Amino acid sequence: MTFHEPLPSNQAAPKALLGKWSSKDAWGEPLKLVISRSGGDAYKAVATAKGKAPEEYVFTVSRHGNRWYLSAGVPKRLGGNFLIGGFDIVDGKELVVYNLDVEQVQQAVDKKELIGRSTEVPEDNGDGVLIDSPAARVLAYLDDPANSDLFVEVARFQRSGK
């Protein structure tokens, strides 16, 4: 699922987000994540899985209510636009990353709560949804307490040094 525009960055990320994190992937292999400032209001995450080349992601953050969001550009080869997710930092020692539930967002499009359309995601990644609603409307939808179950945990990292 992608969005036509990113969420506007409205404040710096919490300092606890920066640094080195570690986890295990779905196969139990080590996964390392290093997050740093990238200039302006952007941040850079470099993810390294065992036996694979590092992958770099540039993202911005915004905070609304008690929730932190991230927006990252999607590579053109995968259709472009922006990915939106959420994150929490637990006691400065644990980073939890959330994705949005695709089925619930598709239902919101079907009910006209959001404007969007189905898309084919390149490289055999199946069907996708592109949300065309302006960022203000997307935020109102994400912040609605009725949609609190919209966020699905996709990764949990432990602090692995400063």
Residue ranges: model-predicted function:
Residues M1-L18, K24-L31, S36-K162:
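Calycin-type beta-barrel ligand-binding domains and close structural analogs
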